[in-house]
Amino acid sequence: MPMSSFKRKIKAIQIKIASPEVIRSWSGGEVKKPETINYRTFKPERDGLFCERIFGPVKDYECACGKYKGKKYEGTVCERCGVRVESREARRKRMGHIELAAPAVHIWYLESIPSVLGTLLNMSTSDLENIIYYGSRRVIERAFIVTDPKDTPFSQGDVIYETEYRIYRKKWDFEVEQAFVVKNPKSPVLSDIDGEVTLKTEKSITGREITWIIVKNITRATHTVLPGMILVVKDGQEVEKGQDLTKEMTIDPVYAPFDGHVEIDELSNTITLKPLTTSKDQPVVFTAPYGAKILVSNGQKVKKGDQITTSTSLPSVKSSISGTVRFGSNLNIRALEDGNFEVLSTGEVYVEQVIEERKYPVFEGALVYVNNGDQVKKGDHLADRFLFEEEYLSATEYKIFESHYPTMFDVEERTENDRPIVVITDIDPEVSKETGLKVGDIVTENEYEAYLQIYPEKIVADAGAQAIKKLLQNLDLEALQAEIEAELKKLPSSSSKAIKLRRRLKMVKDFLKSGNKPEWMVLEVVPVIPPDLRPMIQIEGGRFATTDLNELYRRLINRNNRLKKLLELGAPEIILRNEKRMLQEAVDALIHNGSDSEGKRSRRAVLKDRNGRPLKSLTDLLKGKKGRFRRNLLGKRVDYSGRAVIVVGPHLKIHQCGIPKKMAMELFKPFVLAKLLGEGSSSKTMRKVKKAIIEKEMPEAWEVLEEVIKGSVVLLNRAPTLHRMSIQAFEPKLVEGNAIQLHPVVCPPFNADFDGDQMAVHVPLSAAAQAEARFLMLSRYNIISPAHGKPISLPTQDIIIGSYYLTTVSKEFDSLKEEDVKWKFSSPEEAMLAYHLGFIKLHTPILIKVVINGEEKRIKTTLGRVIFNSILPEDLRDYNRIFDKKQINTLVYETFKRHGIDRAADLLDDIKDIGFHYATVSGLTLSLKDLKIPPERDEILRKTWEKVRIIEENYEKGFLTEEQRKSEIIRLWMSVTEEITKLTSRTLAEDPFNPIYMMVNSGARGNIDQVKQLAGIRGLMIKAYDPRSREIKSKIFKGQAIHEALTFDYPVDKNLREGVDILQFFISTYGARKGQVDTAMNTSFAGYLTRRLVDVAQSVTVAEPDCGTHEGIRAMDLIKEGTVVEKMNEFLFGRVLAKDVLDPETKEVLKNPETGKEYTRNTMLTDDDANFLASYKKMVDVVRYEEIDITELSLPNMYAEIAEPVGEYEEGTELTWDVVKAAKNEGKYRIKVKVYPVVGTVYAEEEPLYDKKGERQLLVYQEVINEIVAKMLEENGIEKVPVRPDIIVRSPLTCESEYGVCAACYGMDLSNHKIVNVGESVGIVAAQSIGEPGTQLTMRTFHVGGVMGASDIVSGLTTVEKTFEPYAFLREEKSGGKKEIRKYYGSESILCEVDGFVKDIATDESGRTVIYVEDYAGNIHAYKVPKRAKVRVEKGQKVLRGETLTSGAIVWWKLLELESEKGVMTAMNLLKIIKNAYVQQGVSIHDKHFEIIFKQMLSMATIVDPGDSDYLPDQLVPLVDIKRFNREILEGNAKVEENRKWVIGKTLAKRIIAETEEGELVELAQKGDEVTEELLKKIIEAGIKEIDVFEKDKVVTYQILPKEPIKYKRRLLSLKKAALNYPGWLSAAAFEETAWVLTAAAIEGKVDPLIGLKENVIVGQLIPSGTGLDVFAGIQVEETPRAAVEEELA
């Protein structure tokens, strides 16, 4: 069956911001209605969220109305319902869209940290939110009232707020008074006195009416005045008693002035003289004076000159009292020219004397209850109020009311208002210059209106998303880039403004580079995802369950439609604003319904369903464990799989598993069916018949199944899949029952046991998959762990006890002499016969002839040992050894090394069979009697309690402190516990066949600590604690031993065999609970650690056979604080040499005398090689004098100096070819030299080497000896030194492959002990190797012993976490501009910056300890010790660069700065710390796995000087990119001259902006201009280094000036940061912070080159690793029929 070869279809994936046009192009139509389906017909509503016209048909190849049915109409669009006839699969692909009635901002770009919109527009997030959500600004300000508007559009009395007033005042002339706001006026207005009311109205300064209610209590004198009298007083005039009110006067008679007739009006006492009709005279009216007699009668004719009245005299009227004159209301008077009044009729003039008066001003609008002249009583209501609440009064008005109504109202001088804000989107340049405003400034609505009145049509401001859109549209990114770059040149690079500007510049460049337009961050169109991705299903009771997204879309459509309607109706702005805000919130909720990524609550309300559960938005669909990335793209479910409980299969071979028949039939059903159908008919009837055969389980079905599974393999997986050995391939064997049978030896890699564990089965389908599974994943090829290169599939428990029982002997065996042995046999067969006949037992001592290394020998042994050795390879047999767990492990490993993986696998099977058999034969049982309690125990305890009593007495007497008492007791009980443990072990060992002793001693189950608790003493118990608690930290700082702080000082002195009392039981519960809690908490933590490790390292594969580097790392013992963490042989194992290993004495390539192997560069080191090199050392001369012949063509192969002057070269100069040349010029043929053989070797003694005086260390262990040190040794008379070769091995850390590592730098594939294959996923293997044992690294019970520093506190997982997240445990404190980093626990460790000697440790004036280090040149370096740190060095001690001088945390960036560019020293320090944590738990992991992780953590660098790159200072950039850029710069600089000639005559593809010397930006050339020599010269002079030109319709960039390379600084990143800074955005988005990663990538228009494994799994193509490499892409795979011989073997 030939298979087509695969090709990688997708090369890269780019992410960009979608423009409205792109969103519309995706769409199948606009969704206009919020409806989903019709609840009567269950069909989707037209134009709704499930519309068939937009998204495709619900039924396969059938339109909505049913007119077109069947595949033949595919592609037809129904003219009746508008639905395209196609597969219903379309409903998973086709999208819709919603046209928004108003723009809405995409929430990701607003709420990202830092905010993209905020950075680009140079606005704070809070301001942006206020603009977008139509927010307001709280303003506390004064108000003013216009008193004189002059020539302005204001009216008198208009209120203007201070902000507006400042704006108006600059341009307009008008007068104002400060305004006061009335608060709490008391009402109504009551009269304080009895009296009469007078009302008076007047206008205030602001043009508003004030009514004065005047109440007077008065006495009144009435004076009658008569017609004709002349009043000499005015109304309101003050008069004294007796003063004249009228004149005393004589009135002359009245004569007729013309002819006419008289009319007399007695009522008004007037005489009217009317002229004749012929006359031109006018009628005249006379008042008849009081007392004068009228001489004519009514109607009488008179002649001119006739007397009409007689003369009379009128006395004066005098005032009877002092007071105010008031004219009576009936008084009829006429004003005279002299200011007096003539009385025309009788009336009254009053003189009022005011006893009491009150005035009540009332503001306009108040209701006055009284009228003029009304009499009121005290307490009567005059008006409903005098002022209104919130009334604005001018200063003058305020004074009036304040003087009349003190304490009856309050005022506010300043008002507090929430003013809606707007952002300026356009402004006239002149106005901008005048006002200082610019586009993007935020003003309140009042301010905007003020500006608009002054500068009509010259300023535009707006709020909401449309305002942001306008701002983004107005951005000229190219000009902005030039402007920011110009500003950055003027600023110091470390200033906060420069950092902010650089961030902004990066964003501008990203937009320019990606071709994204900033306004696309504001949505005009919202895409609607396909309906099958947000399904709606019917549930019981006829109701429908739907995805939250549908609810979010429904809200959005409802609000959008409502806004459209309001816009059509021309609704008021305030309603529209509210509706737009709600629309924005609906879009926000759809995209991201909830608080932002940092946990800071958003200002938006979270939309919830009726149960109060937040609705899941599009962001929730992507992020987290249940998001699209991790659940659907990276965690697909697979078909052809099953799951069942596992049971042990003792009869199976290591590569076999038992599959239940039913399960196998289901898994292989299609294959069985195909086989049953055979070549014959595949008609429907035949298929049904054959299916029935399978379903009814007829005998034929089982026969065919047996045939089908022959030669197949299946994959077994046990969750949690912590490493690659958790999935292995097995050949299936059909078994009865329902459980999968598993070979017991493969339990350790699966971490499986048979207490109810379940395993999953998967069937590889294709021939290629079967081949891969068989050759790569079969369990017999996976017995060696890729984590450490030792066997992992190993016998356990019963098998171990069986083998141990078989090979163990009685106590007398060793002392029995050969001649005393009763039984002697000539062959193993003879011995077996004797055993079966019952003459001897398995453990009876016998003498037997066996073949050892080809020779027949007679040995003393037992039959058990003979039986066991019979299954071993001949060269590994040992008849005098007990085979416990450790021995069996060694045996399997040695078999693998000597005889290969297949023989090792067969041996495991044989051990399994023999172990199970003899475990059964042993009849192992357990009884209480087997727990032997040491007889001396009681006496030891009695003495100990006596010692405790003495300590307590000393404490009570005051000889000991509380801490000392506790410490003494704890140490006492610890030593006693140790003593009893040894006794218990010794007591049990008295009987080698004691079941408990056999179990513990063989390593089958349990350990001596458990036996100690069962039969000896439980000992001291630990308290439950939190390592981060203040109490613990304070104890550390006090220097108290931490184990003492956390231990009960009362022991459990009983054991479990005899039982404990109640108090001891309760003390025990602490430790028991702690164990449970730690395990539970650490499991999830270890899982998270593994996940971070995988994410960091997943793209590291073996990229090439050899990168060619000569760099490497120095092989050494890893020593942490005096403890050897890892021996050099372990360090060397599996490595490849970077340089030849030279013999320290001869300086020739070292050769292994046993194997004859030479250790040249690129040699891979096996176990034996590592052991040889690690143990190889020699005593070598420090110096020797030689005379060399310079006529030879070579110099000495070791460091040499001339021992006599040669030409210009003095004695002591290094011997070089230049020196030889000078000697030849002098005619010399031989010169004396001093040769230093020790230079370039490594000091190999653990004890330091001291100088003559014994004061100063000259050499320390593992120090590489250089010429300076060699001369010191010479000066101190040291002749020979023990040294070993300097071994430099290749490492992933120093590998120079651009992606991943090369095979030579990685070295051995630990799972097969061969050089690693190209394509191996070494990153994933590294992450699994480190993460898999994570659960074992629980918080450990602390070391026993002396006072410990902070380093001893937390080991295990916390140490691992601290190493992989180095900055999570450091706190930055800025003081005086410097960064000071403090440790999470304790202080910072001081690093030595030079090689030298500790000259002195002294205290300075301030009391601080100072370490003085003298370097080789004699310079002194002083290091101040932090207060809480402990000095780790002594006077005279030798210290090397990068060593720690004090306790505390290493500040990694300081260490990185100290070393070379590679970061090796930092990595080795990290390695020591982390290895220590794993070694303490007995976990073995090869260093190279850690190195791969550290390589990834060191894969980024911070830009110090960007040179001519687009990067910014302090930007974090992958090291690979920097190196590639610098390489390209060197290549580009070489082509500058050539490019200058080439661009002449080409057309510019971009305009060119440059900065003048004055700092102004000028345009040198437009897009489309031709490049002339003159223009090119201008461009070059302006310092522009590259230009874009058109070349055959393509834009090509040419470099025309040399460029500067990037200068950078290596960075050590935490795991999380390294994963988030991964070059491909797909993997980073699937890791954490999905929204932010996608946002940043979209802005940048980032291209994911799909180099890692995760990215390729996400896009659904073969991973670029192993057989997924392009090398294998063209391979054709086909199945061939198996040969008959093969069939038989199978």
From Swiss-Prot:
User: Its GO biological process terms?
Assistant: DNA-templated transcription
**Which residues does the record give as Zn(2+) 2 binding sites?**
1107, 1295, 1302, 1305
Listed GO CC annotations:
DNA-directed RNA polymerase complex
Give any GO molecular function from the UniProt entry: DNA-directed RNA polymerase activity
Q: Which Gene3D superfamilies match?
A: 1.10.132.30, 1.10.150.390, 1.10.1790.20, 1.10.40.90, 2.40.40.20, 2.40.50.100, RNA polymerase II, clamp domain, RNA polymerase Rpb1, domain 3
Q: Where does Zn(2+) 1 bind?
A: 63, 65, 78, 81
The superkingdom of the source organism is Bacteria
Is Magnesium among this UniProt entry's keywords?
A: yes
Query: Sorted alphabetically, which Pfam families does this protein's record hold?
Result: RNA_pol_Rpb1_1 (PF04997), RNA_pol_Rpb1_2 (PF00623), RNA_pol_Rpb1_3 (PF04983), RNA_pol_Rpb1_4 (PF05000), RNA_pol_Rpb1_5 (PF04998)
Q: Which UniProt keywords apply?
A: DNA-directed RNA polymerase, Magnesium, Metal-binding, Nucleotidyltransferase, Transcription, Transferase, Zinc
- Record flagged with keyword Signal: no
User: Which cofactor does this sequence's record say it needs?
Assistant: Mg(2+); Zn(2+)
The record's comment on cofactor binding reads: Binds 1 Mg(2+) ion per subunit.
Q: What do we know about how this protein assembles, alone or with others? A: The RNAP catalytic core consists of 2 alpha, 1 beta, 1 beta' and 1 omega subunit. When a sigma factor is associated with the core the holoenzyme is formed, which can initiate transcription.
- Tell me, in a sentence or two, what this protein's role is: DNA-dependent RNA polymerase catalyzes the transcription of DNA into RNA using the four ribonucleoside triphosphates as substrates.
Q: What is this protein called?
A: DNA-directed RNA polymerase subunit beta'
| Organism of origin | Thermotoga petrophila (strain ATCC BAA-488 / DSM 13995 / JCM 10881 / RKU-1)
Q: Which gene encodes it?
A: rpoC
